[in-house]
Amino acid sequence: MSFVAGVIRRLDETVVNRIAAGEVIQRPANAIKEMTENCLDAKSTNIQVIVREGGLKLIQIQDNGTGIRKEDLDIVCERFTTSKLQTFEDLAMISTYGFRGEALASISHVAHVTITTKTADGKCAYRASYSDGKLQAPPKPCAGNQGTLITVEDLFYNIITRKKALKNPSEEYGKILEVVGRYSIHNSGISFSVKKQGETVSDVRTLPNATTVDNIRSIFGNAVSRELIEVGCEDKTLAFKMNGYISNANYSVKKCIFLLFINHRLVESAALKKAIEAVYAAYLPKNTHPFLYLILEISPQNVDVNVHPTKHEVHFLHEESILERVQQHIESKLLGSNSSRMYFTQTLLPGLAGPSGEAVKSTTGIASSSTSGSGDKVHAYQMVRTDSRDQKLDAFMQPVSRRLPSQPQDPVPGNRTEGSPEKAMQKDQEISELPAPMEAAADSASLERESVIGASEVVAPQRHPSSPGSSRKRHPEDSDVEMMENDSRKEMTAACYPRRRIINLTSVLSLQEEINDRGHETLREMLRNHTFVGCVNPQWALAQHQTKLYLLNTTKLSEELFYQILIYDFANFGVLRLPEPAPLFDFAMLALDSPESGWTEEDGPKEGLAEYIVEFLKKKAKMLADYFSVEIDEEGNLIGLPLLIDSYVPPLEGLPIFILRLATEVNWDEEECFESLSKECAVFYSIRKQYILEESALSGQQSDMPGSPSKPWKWTVEHIIYKAFRSHLLPPKHFTEDGNVLQLANLPDLCKVFERC
């Protein structure tokens, strides 16, 4: 059998270029890296990247750099054409990102490329299209800003195997974000943005005036930025300088985040990474890694940048000595970091099972299991030693001393029945004293609470929040207004009367559906079965659920509570009635005098604005009274406020600002009128720290009242507000993310730390 020698042929230039392009441009992220470096070489200060389908369908990168001269557009996409290098010796002193002239050429061999560019001295921009490195047609003049816009379409359209291998657009988009994010951190004086085509919000966005730490925070989050240590060292003997940021011993992740720039070029160094991680091994838990952002500036003649087609590797002289010097400096910075740790509370979903998946067992459950003979052993760290159904004695000791405006006195029977067909269900209630700002508006210092059931147009559907597992649903009635007899609600809201109006108004029903859709059942279960621990201050309180302790934002939760009551009990509120009318003009003047109003002389005289507010609210008086029980008479006096929860009166110090915001912040002419009005009412009724008097201000009046609580607002928070949370609040999902519900401790975790329970 004879073998015939193969014929050696010269490859076609197109084949050669396409093979080379496959080495340089391995995926969309490589193309964006090369073009981003071109933008930086062009002295750009604003770089915008838009992609579609992970960059496989479209890549668009725009800068405001120097642009490309019209004369150079003919050869800009040919191989080995560059403005940064002339002789081979220039490589020894190269300081730019590009030097071979292969990037645009390689991209044009595997995609359709269009370049639109304008120089500072050019009268107009020029657009040109390229394929296989060649100009398709003479450049055409067009409108454009200074800089360059490169559009890359159908990447790897002629390399089918490569395109099939890159079949996950989301993965490719993630790599694009990673590349641009790293360059944005290293170039803190330049604005970067990356977004998908058609999206309005950028996934990466940095500002030109942002610092390096700001950009790290924007890309990697606060968890990294607040644990950074600045590093820096220099060795003239080795001709190198190092600086950057590394994470301290408080921060660790499962995968090392290593940003390395050598002479401002993004590269990789497995040896340097291994050396630094060896230092961190003494400080971080096993199988966790640090965040590292290092900049090495080495004398250019000591660096060989022409090592790899993608330029992600470089070689340099004295590598071992430089790595050892960097390792020693980082070790000195971390020295002593192991002496302390800082722990941050994070928002956790209440009620989720622990890592072991073991169910939490209460003491009542222990008794039942022992009687049934199950024989299950319950560990101390699993026991729940409280019962949310237990009542406290002080729940029956409502404060009777001089109290805050938000604390009602004991009910006083009354005979008012106007507007209500059910006289037997009416109640009256007074408050001993209005706050100091109210004294200027009304000489009288008492409020009467009167249950008023109107009989007009649109009202709230019946709901049963106290029934376990119940959900709020809209009623299918055809008419906009109906009356319902024998409402089965027996809870705390003011609309608990035998006769109710039923709503079918689309705007209100949609708000109810929105509340249902954003509700979080796990949070609801926690609030329904919580055990109140105590108030930290008027804004924060502690509550226990099973074996976990939570810190709850009373202000935000009460605001959401009152908003939901206003929406679900729409037009079914009782009335807190002032026995003597309070002028709206005086309220408006008090509000405008407050810095919170933001009034300036440019807004005009306060008296004129106050008169406008009075006249405006008088026009809305009928709707306010019918739907929200905010009663205003013909003379412009406030005579009633809605009764949302039994035995609760809002902090009346906020009434002037509430009146002002009713006239200025509510979208009266928009479809969102009911929503914005309800939100303003909810803010007014919520527990707010600035309106709660301190104990020192009340000690003189309360010292002679034995048996009464020292701080009546605490009684209100525990026995009125948090009691209402159990049955009336469907907490939204965002409460698990925005810090309004924080898990502070978990009994099993505490037992691991202290080795006892």
UniProtKB/Swiss-Prot annotation:
Acetylated. Deacetylated by HDAC6 which prevents the MutL alpha complex, formed by the MLH1-PMS2 heterodimer, from being recruited to the MutS alpha complex, formed by the MSH2-MSH6 heterodimer, leading to tolerance of DNA damage. Residues 412-652 are annotated as: Interaction with EXO1. A motif (Nuclear localization signal) lies at residues 473-476. The keyword DNA-binding does not apply. The modification N-acetylserine is found at S2. It holds the Pfam family Mlh1_C. Residues 419-430 have a biased composition (Basic and acidic residues). Its main location: nucleus. Keywords: Acetylation, ATP-binding, Cell cycle, Chromosome, DNA damage, DNA repair, Nucleotide-binding, Nucleus, Phosphoprotein. SMART domains: DNA_mis_repair. The keyword Repeat does not apply. Residues 362-375 have a biased composition (Low complexity). Residues 355-378, 400-434, 456-487 are annotated as: Disordered. InterPro entries: DNA_mismatch_repair_CS, DNA_mismatch_S5_2-like, HATPase_C_sf, Mlh1_C, MutL/Mlh/PMS, MutL/Mlh/Pms-like, Ribosomal_Su5_D2-typ_SF, Ribsml_uS5_D2-typ_fold_subgr. The modification N6-acetyllysine is found at K33, K241, K361, K377. GO terms for biological process: DNA damage response; DNA repair; double-strand break repair via nonhomologous end joining; female meiosis chromosome segregation; homologous chromosome pairing at meiosis; homologous chromosome segregation; intrinsic apoptotic signaling pathway in response to DNA damage; isotype switching. It is found in: Nucleus; Chromosome. Heterodimerizes with Pms2 to form MutL alpha, a component of the post-replicative DNA mismatch repair system (MMR). DNA repair is initiated by MutS alpha (Msh2-Msh6) or MutS beta (MSH2-MSH3) binding to a dsDNA mismatch, then MutL alpha is recruited to the heteroduplex. Assembly of the MutL-MutS-heteroduplex ternary complex in presence of RFC and PCNA is sufficient to activate endonuclease activity of Pms2. It introduces single-strand breaks near the mismatch and thus generates new entry points for the exonuclease EXO1 to degrade the strand containing the mismatch. This is DNA mismatch repair protein Mlh1. It comes from Rattus norvegicus (Rat). The lineage of its organism: Eukaryota, Metazoa, Chordata, Craniata, Vertebrata. The gene is Mlh1.
